[in-house]
Amino acid sequence: MTVKTRFAPSPTGYLHVGGARTALYSWLYAKSQGGEFVLRIEDTDLERSTQAAVDAIIEGMTWLGLEWDEGPYYQTKRFDRYNQVIDQLLAEGKAYKCYAPKELLDEIRAEQEANKEMPRYDANHPKIKAVNDAAKEGEPCCIRFRNPKEGSVVFDDQIRGRIEIRNDQLDDLIIRRTDGTPTYNFCVVVDDVDMGISHVIRGEDHINNTPRQINIYKAMGATIPTFAHCAMILGDDGAKLSKRHGAVSVMQYRDDGYLPEALLNYLVRLGWGHGDQEIFSRDEMINLFSLNAISKSASAFNTDKLLWLNNHYIKTSEPEYVAKHLEWHFENQGINKATGPALAEVVKLVGERCNTLVELAQQSRYFYEDFAEFDADAAKKHLRGVAKEPLMLALSKIEALTEWNTEALHHVIAQVCEELEIGMGKIGMPLRVAVTGGGQSPSVDAVMNLIGQERVIARIKMALEYIETREANA
């Protein structure tokens, strides 16, 4: 059997982390089994579905690198096929027309609730039967699936084990609305049959749909796929993950400076694991992934853990790869990458100090842009009269350099310390503030090397002017 999985989001909003984890698990299982992964857009909710949401889902999947082998398929383009199956079910007596108006169904539901009965549709209810018997062909009606009344639906969930639901607990599902549009639970089954889906991996909120869908598979004479229902993701407070917990959209994590590898690594561990291993490459995920290793219990989202992973991937990924993702943040922060060193060189120097690419872009700005003033606290502490002589000596030596590299600049600093008989801090910190505008940066010789000789000279002169002005105003 060829394994074929699918991710089938409804385009009523962005791709959230719960959906992304479901997509990841489906993608991983297909890849781990040498199978195929299908992307299907379930857009039968015409009122709520939007093209913007479709675009956001595809953008999120693409950013995560979850490439699909087939699709994207759109349910709204398959209405003829759904109607064909509905007509077949009607002809076989496995579906029927229901003329009961919504008002009557609401009235019956209220009566059932008042009598402490489970609210459900009953085709044999006297009021419903009377309406259906009196109806004439051509009057508005919906189509309902004739659910079996005897026996049970039993399936072996790959995560939760054996699940059994009695058929008398299930009512006759609407499969086509009065307006002629087919419904979600029906379309899903037809799609999975037509597309040859072997494994349905989805959230636990779909468990109640599964027995209803299995009965439709049986009515169609189709092979029933294997099901796996994943537990929900909770916020760090134990409540269901929602907007109030911060970013829940996949692309919001991109905007906040996360690498896709970090988010994928974090999501795969939200419910699945392999021993005590925390870091997984994409290939390791594929080779090690299994459905029966997914936990039945809900997982709590921990932003600190995600930040730790992101820092790991910024530090250990190829600098050119990190630089490719950093470009977006440079553009977003209005930094022109053409006015300074190669981004990959900056990543090598600054990357390990940053948890996100947003921080990395912010901390790299001085490589590409001159600043009008120094950080007030750093300048007050380090750009004082005592720093004037070391800076002037460093400036003269830097101006005289014919080779520009980190080693030569390190030698300049060492010479200043030796000639003036001062410690490294007496020149290192004033130089750092002079060339970066602030008090924190990687090794100042490496920083100056990337900034470039012309800019370094201009900035040291600016620092000396600052000191002179400060002394004059003292």
Curated annotation (Swiss-Prot):
Q: Which InterPro entries match?
A: aa-tRNA-synth_I_cd-bd (IPR045462), aa-tRNA-synth_I_codon-bd_sub2 (IPR020751), aa-tRNA-synth_I_CS (IPR001412), aa_tRNA-synth_I_cd-bd_sf (IPR008925), Glu-tRNA-ligase_bac/mito (IPR004527), Glu/Gln-tRNA-synth (IPR000924), Glu/Gln-tRNA-synth_Ib_cat-dom (IPR020058), GluQ/Sye (IPR049940)
Does the keyword Ligase belong to this entry? yes
According to its record, what are the GO cellular component terms? cytosol
- Statement: the UniProt record of this protein carries the keyword Glycosyltransferase: no
Q: Where does ATP bind?
A: 243
Q: Where is this motif: 'KMSKS' region?
A: 240-244
Enzyme Commission no = 6.1.1.17
Q: Name the keywords, alphabetized.
A: Aminoacyl-tRNA synthetase, ATP-binding, Cytoplasm, Ligase, Nucleotide-binding, Protein biosynthesis
What are the GO MF terms of this UniProt record?
A: ATP binding; glutamate-tRNA ligase activity; tRNA binding; zinc ion binding
Q: Per its database record, what is this protein's job?
A: Catalyzes the attachment of glutamate to tRNA(Glu) in a two-step reaction: glutamate is first activated by ATP to form Glu-AMP and then transferred to the acceptor end of tRNA(Glu).
Q: What is this protein called?
A: Glutamate--tRNA ligase
Protein species of origin: Vibrio cholerae serotype O1 (strain ATCC 39315 / El Tor Inaba N16961)
